[in-house]
Amino acid sequence: LIHSGDDAAKADLLPGIAAGETIATLAFTEDNGRWDEEGLTATATADGDAWKLNGSKSYVLDGHTASLIIVAARTAAGVSLFAVDGDATGLTRTALSTMDQTRKQARLEYSDVSGTLIGTEGKGWDVLSRVLDLAAVALAAEQVGGGQEVLESAVQYAKDRVQFGRPIGSFQAIKHKCADMLLEVESAKSAAYYAGWCAAELNEELPSVASLAKAYCSEAYFHAAAENIQIHGGIGFTWEHPAHLYFKRAKSSELL
């Protein structure tokens, strides 16, 4: 909405989102899994002053609970963005069961669903490209936070857990693991910080830097989460310990 250039839509929709009264999401990915302009096949057809949307979207975060859905669909002029009410007639929403058990993803099916055009018809892909870059930077920062959390958890457990008469953190094998985790997490921070600067400047480096940051930070997070379980041993493999949650979240973040 912010980058759409549609002042009327911003004035109408942003206050509710900012106040937490409106749960909003972006319906972009389709069954083909493509993240490119030609991969968008859902359609929107003009119907007087309104638009009718048809097609399906998959892996939509909070798609089954959102009260506002921004949908990317193809019109005669190209990819465009539309605001759709979460309870709109003709919209079928199905929650997806995911490995991380958050149940935040959904499949959405549109059958002559009414939507309101946001911004300029045919200019939706330009907006999406920028938004996806900014989202990649935000995800990289989230991955750094997760990596930092599992690093601290592993180090603390290595100090507390005693084996063979001394803390396991005093053994070289564990020290190497913690050192590798620290190296990756700190490197990920640097990548995320630089990507954040590019996002703030909206400079020409943003697309490539955002992709690089997300790729590296996701790998660092997943490796740190896996090593955290290894250092914790048996308890790290139980449902009662949060290590498994970070492991699954780290894996899911690699796919986003």
Model regions: which residues?
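A generic local secondary-structure boundary/capping motif
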Residues: 13-15, 32, 41-43, 57-61, ...
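A short, Trp-centered hydrophobic/proline-enriched beta-strand micro-motif
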Residues: 20-29
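Structural signature of FAD isoalloxazine-binding scaffolds in flavoprotein oxidoreductases
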Residues: 36-40, 84, 248
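Flexible, small-/acidic-enriched active-site or ligand-binding loops
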Residues: 39, 59-60, 86-117
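A short core secondary-structure module
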Residues: 54-92
